[in-house]
Design a protein with these regions (language model features):
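Conserved alpha-helix/loop element of class I SAM-dependent methyltransferases that forms part
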Residues: 19, 27-52
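Conserved SAM/SAH-binding beta-strand->alpha-helix loop
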Residues: 83
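A short glycine-rich, Lys/Arg-flanked "PGG" loop and its adjoining helix->strand segment in the class I
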Residues: 137-149
């Protein structure tokens, strides 16, 4: 039986998201492919993606799962959300795209329909910290009872200690709104953020708070209004310490395995600190991660979760086994500076082997290459029997310097490239909707394109399998001459150069994101 307070709380949340919806994006670190890759790296095999059953709790308009549905037509995807407004619009988008393997349901997670069955991958992003404890436990019950034996789930949530700094910003915004209400001002969702921004801008400029807190407050002012409204003005915002979060999981027969952002579980810290933590925590990975959060002031986590019974099957360790590394696929594209060195995070790469790895990845891009294949290529080129390819690959993955996948991805090279019809419909949605409610996403959501150039998208739709790049160039030149297309260009360039450059960009986008598969 749902208690009365929770019913009222749920109604408030539903009303908030109906009245002030926000753009639904694709979050890379929540994707089933990311979950599978991370767990594969740790020696644990999750179900195949192609035929997976996927559930998203709090799916909004479906922007996080629609790309997965497009990529995996044999998969079965379901999203649930409290907001009927967002569910209805999301289903209209799905119908427009012609997708039959995904549906969105207007449903409270506390009333979850058991007939929906079991799921191989469950996503719950941007929900857990923003509901009360009864709903949190309801979410965990759904995961426990509806996750397949070797399945995995994603739960994201705000964390302490980092959020203690941000609570100052939340408190001052809520304080100002309450003060103005008491003076007779009409405060509602349409103006609450405006007044809140004023309060934190004042703090940012004049406060005696320490610089770290002031920096965090200043960062809030750069966020969109809808983000600030739901992040800082919701009735519920309950950050958690990781160890308390894991206690809740254990009560439901679940465990935190690692953070989907591996650097949060295996940070790059000094050997001295690592040795002290190992002496303190032993094999208790949760305790060690909690210390990392204290040391690094973490404010947000994306936990990969599975059944507690699976713990012994997973190598939860910074020391990844070579057998697990071999079949991970990676890709990346890198540029050298004027001195002939690769530059990563403003550091010149002078290590010969790392430079060779970046050479090979760049030559192979946008195709992926397994780390086993990479190691063999390095041996062939440097003529040495021993190398550090596996260690360097881990460094690149943990540092988010390569894209990593659980399956091989190969670009289909064609002179007359053909955009897959399902992706043409996807692009058409953004071309015909000046204010789309979902974000255009790259493959697996590594990038969300908030600013969309409809002309560029229209050029992409010209790759229909009947035209070469030159044919498209000639077509656009004629359209420009007829006044049907407007080409803007800077001084020193020509319309023809701009058109050719745009065609190349569009071809690369299609190939890099496998839109012609």
């Amino acid at each position: 039986m749902i208690n009365k307070e929770t019913i009222e709380n749920v109604k408030a949340v539903q009303s908030s998201y109906d009245e002030a919806p926000y753009k639904s994006k694709t979050f890379y670190y929540t994707q089933p492919g990311r979950q599978q890759m991370v767990l594969k790296l740790l020696g644990f095999k999750t179900p195949d993606l192609e035929n997976a059953r996927v559930l998203e709790i709090g799916c909004s308009f479906g922007g996080n799962i629609i790309p997965f549905a497009l990529e995996n037509p044999k998969a079965d995807i379901i999203g649930i959300d409290l907001s009927g407004v967002q569910i209805d619009e999301g289903n209209r988008i799905i119908e427009y795209l012609g997708l039959e393997n995904i549906r969105l349901i207007h449903q409270n997670v506390l009333d979850f329909d058991d007939k929906l069955g079991k799921f191989d991958y469950i996503i719950c992003h941007g929900v857990f910290s923003w509901v009360n404890e009864e709903v949190q436990r309801g979410i965990l019950n759904v995961i426990k009872n509806h996750l397949t034996e070797n399945g995995s789930a994603i739960l994201s949530y705000n964390t302490y200690p980092g959020w203690k700094n941000l609570e100052v910003a939340r408190d001052v915004m809520l304080f100002r709104d309450e003060m103005l209400k008491n003076r007779g001002e009409q405060i509602n969702e349409s103006n609450a953020v405006k007044y809140g921004r004023g309060a934190i801008e004042f703090l940012s400029q004049f406060s005696m708070l320490n610089e770290k807190i002031k920096t965090g407050i200043t960062g809030i002012t750069e966020k969109d209004d809808y983000y600030i409204l739901h992040e800082y003005f919701e009735e519920n915002n309950q950050p958690l310490y990781l160890y308390n979060f894991n206690k809740m999981l254990l009560e439901h027969g679940l465990i935190h395995v690692v953070d989907s952002d591996l650097m949060k579980t295996f940070p790059n810290i000094s050997n001295e600190i690592e040795e002290k933590l190992t002496a303190e925590c032993g094999n208790d990975n949760i305790a060690k991660e909690q210390y990392y959060d204290f040391l690094l002031d973490r404010q947000f986590r994306i936990s990969i979760v599975t059944h507690e019974a699976n713990k012994e099957k997973i190598n939860i360790s910074k020391d990844v086994r070579i057998t697990d590394l071999k079949e991970i696929d990676i890709r990346g594209k890198y540029e050298k500076n004027k001195d002939g060195f690769y530059t990563i995070e403003n550091n010149e790469i002078k290590d010969e082997e790392v430079s060779l790895i970046l050479d090979i990845l760049s030559e192979n891009y946008p195709n992926t290459i397994t780390i086993d294949e990479l190691e063999k290529k390095v041996r062939e080129k440097n003529k040495l029997e021993t190398n550090n390819v596996y260690a360097n690959a881990v460094y690149l993955m943990y540092g988010k310097l390569v894209e990593a996948y659980s399956r091989k991805l190969t670009v289909k090279k064609e002179e007359k490239i053909k955009l897959n019809p399902k992706y043409k419909k996807y692009l058409d949605y953004f071309i015909t909707n000046p204010n789309p409610v979902i974000a255009l996403a790259s493959y697996e959501g590594t990038i969300n394109y908030d600013t969309i150039n409809p002309i560029m998208l229209s050029i992409m739709t010209l790759f229909d399998g009947t035209r070469t790049d030159e044919d498209i160039f000639n077509f656009l030149v004629e359209k420009e001459k007829a006044g049907e297309v407007v080409i803007t260009f800077e001084e020193g360039s020509s319309k023809e150069e701009v058109i050719k450059n745009n065609i190349e960009i569009c071809r690369n986008f299609i190939e890099i994101n496998f839109l012609n598969k």
